[in-house]
Amino acid sequence: KPREYISFRLGAGTSTFADGKILRNGKPIAIKSARYNARTTYDEALAEIKALKAQGINTLLPDNPQPEWFYDICDGLGVYVIERANINPNEQSQNRKIGGTPSNNPDLVGEYLARVKAMYYRTRNHSCIIAYALGGDAAGNGYNMYKAYQWLKGVEKNRAIICTSAEGEWNTDL
């Protein structure tokens, strides 16, 4: 006998990745993106996102986790989101020695995986999510990003996974 009901809007649509392209319902999408972080109320964010959509923006790139209602707004308006894990180390280094950068420090792998898992489980049921990003633009690459990519590929079979710091390495789909 159910003890609790939680309402959740469902969106229809599939996001997949093939031949270097993000597909929505099997068709390639032309992404016109903008960085956006909901630092406002629901009503203000709704108005801002509607205005961005009116300008032709169809994809939002938040820098960090957003309030749950942000994803609900995007689901409702048909705006796509490339969700980013909250991995933004202050140390920016291209030092590829073990420990030379936080992303290549095996002591931090648990923290990296926890953030990627939180991102995935928080947003996996939102139809607006078309791809996942493994951290900020300056997150660097290395052991922790490899492990994060492998874990995410193990649970997410359809959406693209992006590591902007991969620079030609294997741990990114785009």
Language model feature labels by segment:
Residues L46, T59-L174:
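Substrate-binding/catalytic cleft of secreted carbohydrate-active enzymes
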